[in-house]
Regions:
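Generic recognition of short, well-ordered alpha-helical segments
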Residues: 43, 109, 138-139
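Short beta->alpha junction loops/turns
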Residues: 44, 101-103, 141
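Hydrophobic ligand-binding cavity/cleft-lining segments
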Residues: 2-66, 119, 165, 179-184
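Short alpha-helical basic/polar micro-motif
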Residues: 36, 112, 153
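Hydrophobic-ligand binding "helix-grip"
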Residues: 49-53, 57-66, 73-124, 128-130, ...
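A conserved amphipathic terminal alpha-helix motif
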Residues: 131, 135-179, 183
Length: 184
């Protein structure tokens, strides 16, 4: 099942379709926060259990400035699964790529891109995965759109809590570097 949501401070446009046995979601959303702040929030995997629905625990195995490997335990109703992923961090481009290492999936990848926008930050988020278990895959497919929407909303709510509700609109002058001629 594939879901695409395009949203800018309003009701999202949602498109869903089946793509083999993989579950896919893509979303672009404008959030009134700085791209650097949102990048830092998503890169801070260790804190996911504090605010992310169904994330019960997070353990960082290894980390440096540009990558980390982490174990996450996710749980929903009677399901509880642990998986490991590698997270590639690109702070210069404000991009995060997540690759699956081990756990209950056949395949898992997701990406985040944080782009400057006149209203704050445009987030480009993509995830696709397939579980090894057909039972787990069928359960997730019925709940998938709502689950991903809640997860993305949890990041936005966390950003509001950490960085303030919604900063004032960023003007074009604030977004551009200011250059002044030397006084002579």
């Amino acid at each position: 099942m594939q879901t695409t949501i395009l949203r800018r401070f309003g009701t999202p446009e949602i498109r869903r379709w089946q793509q083999a046995d993989m579950t896919v979601h893509s979303e672009r959303r404008v959030i009134p926060h700085r791209p650097e702040d949102l990048y830092a929030l998503v890169a801070d995997v260790r804190r996911y259990p504090e605010f992310l629905p169904w994330c019960l625990a997070a353990r960082i195995r290894q980390a440096d400035e540009h990558a980390l490997s982490a174990d996450l335990i996710i749980g929903f109703r009677m399901f509880r699964e642990r998986f490991t992923s590698y997270v590639e961090l690109n702070p210069d481009q404000l991009e995060i790529e997540v690759k699956y290492a081990e756990g209950p999936f056949k395949y898992l990848t997701n990406s985040w891109r944080f782009l400057p926008h006149e209203d704050g930050c445009e987030i480009d988020f993509h995830v696709d995965f397939e579980f090894n278990s057909r039972l787990l895959q069928s359960v997730i497919e019925t709940l998938f759109t709502d689950a991903v929407r809640r997860m993305v909303q949890a990041f936005e709510t966390r950003a509001n809590a950490l960085y303030g509700r919604a900063p004032e609109r960023i003007s074009a002058d604030q977004a551009r570097p200011q250059v002044t001629a030397p006084q002579g």
